């Protein structure tokens, strides 16, 4: 299995888009299906574009909705620089749908290393996915540094 974070198109109507989010960092992984509003991927791509602008740069996006009050799952992506050399880290949280009678949802949190050039490609793929409503956006991840 490749180390990656993948956003894959599943379905859309006039209001919402359904995506499958899956991630694997070489040690931990998870996936969920979630719902976002039309155009939300383009907005998220704008937030992530140009990262990192400096060593103190931090970015965060959430897709879907966490908790039992909404249908579908959710993911949260927090990006940061971890050292003076500009190494980048992604903290990913993926939560599954609670289902009809579930009191808890499955959830995974993982840390991932990535290169800024890979994020640039991911951002472009997010924009394409937003406009075409087909395919996937894939962020290639690196083996974790200790």
Regions found by a protein language model. Name each.
Residues 23-25, 65, 94-100:
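Short acidic, glycine-rich loop/turn motifs
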Residues 21-23, 34, 79, 92, ...:
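Preference for bulky hydrophobic residues occupying beta-strand positions
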Residues 3, 17-21, 30, 57-59, ...:
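One face of beta-strands
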């Amino acid at each position: 299995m490749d180390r990656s974070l993948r956003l894959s198109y599943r379905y859309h109507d006039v209001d919402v888009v359904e995506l499958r989010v899956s991630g694997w960092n070489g040690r931990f992984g998870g996936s969920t299906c979630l719902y976002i509003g039309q155009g939300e991927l383009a907005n998220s791509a704008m937030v992530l574009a140009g990262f990192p602008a400096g060593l103190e740069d931090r970015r965060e996006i959430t897709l879907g909705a966490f908790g039992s009050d909404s249908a579908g799952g959710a993911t949260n992506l927090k990006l940061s620089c971890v050292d003076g050399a500009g190494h980048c880290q992604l903290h990913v949280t993926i939560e599954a749908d609670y289902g009809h009678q579930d009191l808890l949802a499955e959830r995974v949190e993982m840390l991932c290393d990535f290169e800024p050039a890979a994020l640039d490609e991911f951002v472009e793929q997010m924009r394409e996915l937003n406009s075409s409503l087909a395919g996937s956006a894939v962020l290639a991840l690196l083996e974790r540094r200790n």
